[in-house]
Amino acid sequence: MTSNENFENGFDLPPPDDSAEDLKLFIKKFERSLNSALLEFDENNQETIENFRQAKEHKMRFETECDQKLRNWKRLAIEREVSEEQSGEVQFPRWIDEWANTKLGGIFERIFSKMDSMQNDMNSRFDAMQTEMSVMKNGIASIKGEMAEMKGEMTVMKNDIASIKGEMAEMKGEMAVMKNDIASIKGEMAEMKGEMTVMKNDIASIKGEMAEMKGEMTIMKSDIDSVKGETTTLKGEVTAMKDSISQLDRKIDLLDQRTEERFNNMAQTMQKIDDRSCKSMMLTRKYENMVRSDMHYSAVPVPFLNGDEPRDYELPPLASFEDIDNLTKEQCIQYLHGYGVNKFSPLETVKLKERLQEAIGLWSKGHESHKYHTF
């Protein structure tokens, strides 16, 4: 007899002829090819969780299609054998329906055994996937713990910096007091110079009276010489004090320069730490959204690279694909700039929304069919 059944199988197996025996042989070859393909699926799809899910879904669809084909072909094999018995092509009498399994070489038993094996395999793989999801959740919890420790260390570092700033403020206060003392010394030196001027006037007055005091000239000269000696000593001391003050001024200038350099270096270091912390927080939120989206939970806000939150710029929150689809083009571009995505064409529409979806980690196999609208 002739049949029009579709024997396209995906394994390049030639279709059977119209005999029941050849159809049973075709079924056995298909089962072996199917087992080999399933084993290859298991071996080649363990690299990442995403690939494993995709392979799992593809495998389940493939198993369902193949199971349906097997059922149709086995039903066809029974019909053909019954037809051959009725036409006299088979050399033994037709048996009742319950003996069909025996006439086909125990094929029903093998079908049910294979179905049980496939069900057990699917259950074990589902359990393995749940175990992997549990491991992933534990990993995320560990990352959150490390981030909390890092925040604690950052708090300690900020406190140390505040302490250093306080000590520097105290040092500046002491420097101000020292400058006031130096100014006071300079004022006293000015007063001393005034007194020296008065002394010079007194000496001039003494010289005017020398004509009247010739008898006391010798004594006056001795007094004047003594005064000159003391004046010379005082000038030397004043010169030494000026040198000390000049050296102190140079040291103060050098200390101010070094202090400013240290503050600049410290500011640069703090900026680098803030940049890295902001980027780390952005990536952590992105990976968290990937897991939440895969589990059909709403996305959490992802901070920008500079540490600011989107709400600081009065941008609407993004918790789902619909929120992205409702953005204006200006809001979408502002979001992309905040996440460091700057290379795109101004003519893009749907592609901009897809870039923003990837930037915040809003992605799941279950949402691949979502289509965005143009602006």
From Swiss-Prot:
Chief location of this protein within or outside the cell: cytoplasm
InterPro entries noted in UniProt: Mug135-like_C (IPR013902)
Gene3D superfamilies in the record: 1.20.5.170, 1.20.5.190
Subcellular location: Cytoplasm
Residue ranges crossing the lipid bilayer per the database entry: none
Any Gene Ontology CC annotation: cytosol
Keywords: Cytoplasm
Pfam families reported for this sequence: Mug135_C (PF08593)
Similarity-based family: Belongs to the UPF0612 family.
Name assigned to this protein: UPF0612 protein C569.003
Organism listed in the record: Schizosaccharomyces pombe (strain 972 / ATCC 24843)
Lineage, top ranks: Eukaryota, Fungi, Dikarya, Ascomycota, Taphrinomycotina
